[in-house]
């Protein structure tokens, strides 16, 4: 499949990877007894949203939305349709794929197997990060959000322009609303919150991730220790499968506080690298970073993110922004909400840059030098 990597990337915006559903579908068809002999119209191959819609409607609807379809590696994000060359390449029939709809379409009706006394409309379907982008109010080109979790998703709305990445990001569809699609650039990072779990479970340096803030604030400001959390290689924007995790630059006085701080800094520095790649790819000057997820409760991390990016970082007042975004889309689809009136700044916490430019450049420079040492990545 490797020789088709460029073809797949050009049509789908995604790098060839078994992470995406196309490879999984091909495997299922080859390894499920009788699957290849069945009429393709008797098979349903799709993402989790299409399965849920199928079950909730008792098999009456097999549908998906643009955001989920665009992550299958079978969907052409330029023609906005299943791509014959791609699904034949993976041995999948178009007859087995879900109908692609706007994210705020009427997907079907359900009573949730009798939970409701009457059927209600299913008016929304969207990918997790895509829904969070919408829930954050990032509805226009140039707006950007980061969801912090075990890993992190950084996503920029590029509006109706499909921007091809030259700096290690993927291009995808944000959503389709009322007949109009928006595109995104996205960078996914494997180890962010998971670094704190590693400190707790394997090194026993902290008893909970919440403790990391106090340790980081108590660290020696002169210490330059850098932690590269490449436990399974490095993802966006570096994409190195061979990189290994390292703690670099320790001295005799480096202790627990300094290592914990380096781990926290690795989260912010990885995200900063993706933000820089997004500005280069899009030629858009980012104005603000909207953030959500559990680690955003760490004020040290949020202030550092603001300092490194030289951006105001706005922490959402609502944790479940993916659910909120999907609910907003459903409300628009049902005609009870107006998109222009959705987003509110109420409850947000705002962090503004405070770090000197000299200190900022030194931290980013030390990080980039460490990246070069572990994977030979070209870093500006």
Residue ranges and their predicted role:
Residues 95-99, 285-288:
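Short acidic capping loops at alpha-helix termini that bridge into adjacent secondary structure
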Residues 103-106:
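Gly/charged, well-structured mid-domain segments that form the phosphate/adenylate-handling core
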Residues 1-62, 73-89, 110-292, 296-380:
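Active-site core segments that coordinate phosphate-bearing ligands/cofactors
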Residues 63-69:
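Nucleotide/phosphate-binding loop and acidic/charged catalytic motifs
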């Amino acid at each position: 499949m490797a020789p088709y990597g460029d073809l797949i990337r050009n049509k789908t915006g995604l790098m060839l990877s078994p992470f995406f559903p196309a490879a999984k579908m091909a495997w299922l068809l080859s390894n499920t007894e009788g699957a290849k002999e069945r009429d393709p119209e008797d098979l349903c191959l799709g993402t989790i949203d299409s399965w849920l819609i199928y079950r909730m409607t008792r098999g009456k609807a097999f549908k998906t939305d643009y955001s989920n379809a665009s992550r299958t590696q079978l969907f052409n994000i330029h023609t906005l349709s299943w791509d014959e060359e791609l699904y034949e390449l993976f041995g999948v029939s178009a007859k087995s794929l879900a109908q692609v709809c706007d994210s705020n379409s009427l997907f079907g009706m359900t009573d949730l197997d009798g939970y409701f006394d009457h059927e209600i409309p299913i008016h929304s379907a969207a990918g997790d990060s895509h829904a969070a982008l919408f829930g954050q109010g990032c509805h226009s080109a140039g707006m950007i959000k980061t969801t912090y979790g075990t890993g992190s998703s950084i996503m920029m709305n590029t509006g109706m322009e499909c921007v091809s990445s030259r700096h290690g990001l993927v291009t995808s569809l944000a959503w389709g609303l009322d007949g109009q699609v928006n595109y995104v650039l996205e960078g996914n990072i494997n180890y962010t919150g998971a670094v704190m779990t590693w400190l707790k479970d394997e090194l026993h340096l902290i008893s909970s991730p919440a403790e990391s803030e106090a340790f980081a604030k108590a660290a020696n400001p002169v210490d330059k220790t850098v932690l590269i959390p490449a436990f399974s290689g490095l993802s966006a924007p570096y994409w190195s499968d061979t990189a290994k995790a390292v703690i670099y630059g320790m001295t005799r006085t480096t202790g627990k506080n300094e290592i914990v701080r380096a781990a926290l800094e690795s989260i912010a520095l990885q995200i900063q690298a993706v933000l820089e790649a997004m500005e280069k790819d899009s030629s858009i000057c980012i104005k603000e970073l909207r953030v959500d997820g559990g680690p955003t409760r760490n004020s040290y991390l949020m202030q550092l993110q603001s300092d490194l990016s030289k951006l105001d970082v706005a922490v959402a007042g609502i944790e479940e922004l993916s659910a909120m975004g999907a609910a907003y889309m459903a409300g628009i689809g049902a005609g009870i909400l107006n998109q222009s009136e959705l987003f509110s700044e109420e409850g947000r916490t705002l962090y503004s840059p405070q770090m000197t430019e000299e200190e900022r450049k030194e931290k980013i420079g030390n990080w980039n030098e460490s990246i070069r040492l572990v994977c030979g990545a070209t870093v500006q």
